[in-house]
C-alpha cells in the first residue's frame, strides 16, 4: 500500500510520543521487556494490564498510534471498518522507532504483537538480549471463534464509548489464528 504520510509528519509525532513516555518513566539498570503475542481479540490487553499492574513498563502497541496519523479522520470517514489497513504502515513505523529509541535507553517495555510470523519475536528477543534486557514472551491463545467475536465486540464497544473504532479484517485475524501454533513451535 502506498505511503500516505510524510517523513516529517512521522518524525514530529514520534518525537511527541517519545517525550510523553520519557516524562512518565525512567530508564532501568536491569531492564525487562515482555513480548506479548496472540491473535487479534484474544485478550492481550488484559494480559498486559496484569503484567503492568504497577505501571512500571511502557506499553507499545501499534494500534495505539493510529489516531496520530495526520489523515486519520479522513481515512476513517472514507474507509470505515477497513480504515486500519490504511494506517497499518504508519503504526508499524512509529512502533519500530519507539522500540529502537526506548530500547537503547533501557526502559522497561511491553511490546504487543500477534505472532503472525515467528521471525519478528525472535528478532526482537535477540535484539533486546544484546542490549542487556531480561526478555519474556507471553502468549494469549483462544479458539478462533472467540477471538473473532472479541474483535467485533471491541469494535462495537468503541463506538458506544464515542471512540473511533478499529475493526480487524477477518482475513488478517484468520491468518494469525492459522499461523500461531506453527510460529510458537518455531520460537520454542
Tell me what each language-model feature is:
Residues 115-158:
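ATP-dependent NMP and nucleoside kinases share a basic, alpha-helical "lid"
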Residues 55-131:
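Conserved nucleotide-sensing/catalytic segment adjacent to the nucleotide-binding pocket
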Residues 23-31, 102-103:
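Phosphate-binding P-loop
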Residues 1-26:
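N-terminal pre-Walker A segment at the start of P-loop NTPase domains
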Residues 44:
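Conserved lysine of the Walker
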Residues 47:
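Hydrophobic positions on the alpha1 helix immediately C-terminal to the Walker A/P-loop
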Residues 149-188:
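Conserved GTP-binding G-domain of TRAFAC-class P-loop NTPases and closely related GTPase folds
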Residues 39-40:
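The conserved Walker
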